[in-house]
């Protein structure tokens, strides 16, 4: 069984407060894009989980969310035998694009189908939050408002058709470190999440992009100015808006046409600002 694990971007990312349990209360608009990892899942007679990945530095044991996801369902339903899972990574690692969470989500979907466990999407999502806050959304996919710690999801009208250019510089940003360095009282500009939802519902791509924002940006760009350079390059070459996704360091630009996106991608590659450059489009459920 082959499955695609789609990357996500944050069209809007706001953080409201830090909770007593240490987690942060967020409001985000999430969007899947047509950039994906590929998983191949097969049954095997011997018990256990055999995981392999195309990058040798990625762990293949319980430190990997794919392994955790498979073990979660197989233990709960006392599945007979085991599975062999091959993960082909194409989504950049530690990029703010939920690659690991999406891999885990695809694993839950795959194990459910392979062993005919009969779980609904909602039942899978309820279990997914045990693995990570982004995993339920990666099962749901499409355009969604995420609240709470990211686990409270409301599907919204699909974002207008558009093209997305991904540019990841050759640096990694720890999500934990990004949260720890965030000064909540010092946030100057909060994205207009409600206004963005209204624009999405009205099919107003330009209105939506004008309101986009990510409260992580100022602090992370202060540490890594190359992120701002990539943003500026995209916006000066046709992007309606370029923004950092999640806690970074990946930058994405929203374009109205593939021609504009392809032209900007060529210039970005030639600039050597980004190690990964990838042009794609949004993925909508409908």
Please place each PLM-identified region on the residue numbering.
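Short, basic/glycine-rich phosphate-binding loops at helix/coil junctions
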Residues: 46-59, 107, 202-212
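Residue-level signal for inorganic ion chemistry
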Residues: 11, 39-41, 66, 100, ...
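Conserved, helical-rich catalytic subdomain that frames metal- and/or nucleotide-binding sites
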Residues: 140, 145-241, 256-262, 266-269, ...
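ATP-binding N-lobe of GHMP and related small-molecule kinases
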Residues: 1-95, 113, 117-125, 147-149, ...
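Hydrophobic C-terminal alpha-helix "anchor/cap" residues
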Residues: 30-33, 128, 234, 268
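Glycine/serine-rich anion-binding loops at beta->alpha junctions
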Residues: 86-115, 133, 240-255
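Short, conserved aromatic-histidine micro-motifs
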Residues: 122-138, 265-282
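Contiguous, small/hydrophobic- and glycine-enriched helical/loop subdomains that border
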Residues: 82, 104, 108-145
